[in-house]
Amino acid sequence: GLEWYYKKTTDMLIAAQYSALAGESSKPYINFGDMKNTGVDFNFNYRDSKGDWSWDFSLNLSHYKNEVVKISEADDASMWGGGTRISGNVTRTTKGHAISEFYGYKVNGFYENVDEVLALPPLGQDVKNAEDAKAWVGKFKFADTDGNGKLDGNDRTFIGSPHPDLIAGLNATVTWKNWDLTAFFYSTIGNDLFNNTKYFTDFWLFEGNKSSRMRDLSWKPGADNSKAVLPVLDYLDTCLLYTSDAA
């Protein structure tokens, strides 16, 4: 069977959105938020038997699109979430986007040389000369998304979504006389994940065991870094203090 659906939810209970000028008191929860979901579901069932054997298969495929319609009178109001004690908030919910999309910096490769560092100094760093710039060669280079020639908080953007492009499920049962075997498979395709574990395994911020990725896939001076996905090994590196789409 094939089904299409549309659902709009109104007056969701959310924290009131207002200017920081109103103070730091707790925000009251009010019935104000609206969102809509559209999607399509596909179901296929097959049953048959032969002699002492019988089998039953059920396949389910689902695709949906979630969109926030309103969380405040102001179109640019946002709700933040998924925070970590390292990099702060991870997700942003705002009008025109899905709930809790990942929000941070886009990684645009690595600083390959001193000139690149001087042309676009790293986020939060005061690089005055070539000597200062040397310390940042081989580290992540964030994208200047607003095109103003410098890296700052305004360069954060939507970098991924936890919502899958496709949800698939398969139930399978095979029976022989009084014996039966049942299996269930579930999969999501196209959704992004925030991997907090990599803070510990792929970077130097914490002591402890590290992944082999640090050894094999880190940027190395003078090497072929076409397959590198992690920055040069440096325990003073601050790139992981910011939420990004780094591998």
Regions found by a protein language model. Name each.
Residues 1-94, 240-244:
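Extracellular/periplasmic, surface-exposed regions of secreted and cell-surface proteins
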Residues 55-57, 170, 176, 181-183:
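Transmembrane beta-strands of outer-membrane beta-barrel proteins
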Residues 32, 77, 81-91, 96-99, ...:
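C-terminal extracellular loops and terminal segments
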Residues 137, 188-244:
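Extracytoplasmic gating/loop element in the C-terminal half of outer-membrane beta-barrel translocons
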Residues 10-15, 181-184, 192-195:
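Extended hydrophobic-aromatic, low-complexity segments
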Residues 49-160, 225:
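Conserved small-residue
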